[in-house]
Amino acid sequence: LTAILAPAAWAAEGTDEAQAEAKTTLTAADAAQMQQADAAVTALTGSEEYEQMSREQRRAAALDELDGLARKGLVRRSSIRTDEENGIVSFTYSCGVLGGILFTPADELEEMTLDAGENGLRPPRGLAEASPSAEMPLTEDVREAAAARQNARQSDENALPDTIGRAAIYYAFDNTVNSSRFPYYSYMQGFWEGMGIRTTMNTRVTLADLRRMDRYDLCILSAHGAYYTYSYGALWKRTRTEPIILLTEESTFYKDIVYSFELLSHRVIKMNGLYCATADFFRNAYRAGQLSSTIVYSETCEFLGVTGSVDESMAEALLAGGARAVLGYVNNVYTVYSRSMLWDTVNHLGMGMTIGGAVTHAKDTYGENDIIWYTEQGGRRPHAAAAYLVLYGDPNARLNVPANYSVAQRADEITVDDIFGEVLDRAA
């Protein structure tokens, strides 16, 4: 009897899953059930107790929570999967939408190594107390270029345009409150504005915002990333792993309905009750090639997967959307290395360099990968796999800097501190 009934039960579950996967819209009941599950997940992951737990305790707590949700019929028990390497428990909601719980928070995956923490890492020299201007000093050529730009503005002859490009920083590392990261990005925004790169800072990044990247010449994705593995298939289970970008946009009943098609098609998933974008999200958003004037620079961890399993789907999706060039990291990247590379690259784009030349300059300055940078700072116990920046697309892409822009002829009378003194003082 058992031998006959068990396959029948499995078949029934598989039929339910097949029907759910055939959906193209979420019902109000589906969204309400997801919100019930999300409330339980966020109550766990947002608790002080969860924050104080060890990695193993978090994993156990996540599995226990999902077990309870499976008993209530809110998630599919057969979909629950633990990814030890990437610190995620993935699952599927009963309606077919993908979700996950991070038991290794993103900040730990890309830890700056400023404290021992669970990783037992020693800090590089003095970086714990570094101000933005100290951590990210101006190279001499950038100082001269900034001064030259101001001189050119003051002269009618060979005057430069007020704007050499439009940039957007999509800042989704945190909500900026008591943030150790945000002051650096505010500093960069102010400096780039002075160079003539009109820079928008978006600190409440939504999926809708990521559909409007074609408005800018340079888009900077400053967010956490992860390598997400999930199970799919009604009767024959298979697994798939792909990079995702974690946003700070909270899931709501209304947004679940609005995003229903993208959630059900797995272009968007939920992690800790927050929305995340996949490569297919970008592929669909820019299927008409709207990014033809845009360079995309991603700081997210594992944007291109990991060593031994490089995944170019994010870069390919953006290039298919017309992006002139796409930059991103393989593996988890140290925070300071990542933003230092960004700082140097964009500074040199503002000087008129091509994106290929600017990236080469940044690597020459800070190292080919983050372990080289880490050891040069005096670090003694680097993480296991070096993160390195890869450029796809046209290495000759550049901002609208005039060909007659001459640093040497225009840097005699003014210093960068005169131009950006207020920015430097505020960031110090």
Show the residue positions of the predicted features:
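A domain-level signal for caspase-like cysteine endopeptidase catalytic cores
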Residues: 30, 38-49, 61-65, 130-256, ...
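Structural alpha-beta junctions
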Residues: 72, 189-201, 318-329, 353
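Surface-exposed patches in mature extracellular/periplasmic domains of secreted proteins
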Residues: 77-79, 200-208, 329-331, 355-358
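Active-site-proximal C-terminal subdomain of hydrolase catalytic domains
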Residues: 295-426
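Catalytic cores of nucleophile-dependent amide-cleaving enzymes
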Residues: 245-339
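Long terminal accessory regions outside catalytic cores
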Residues: 12-108, 116-119
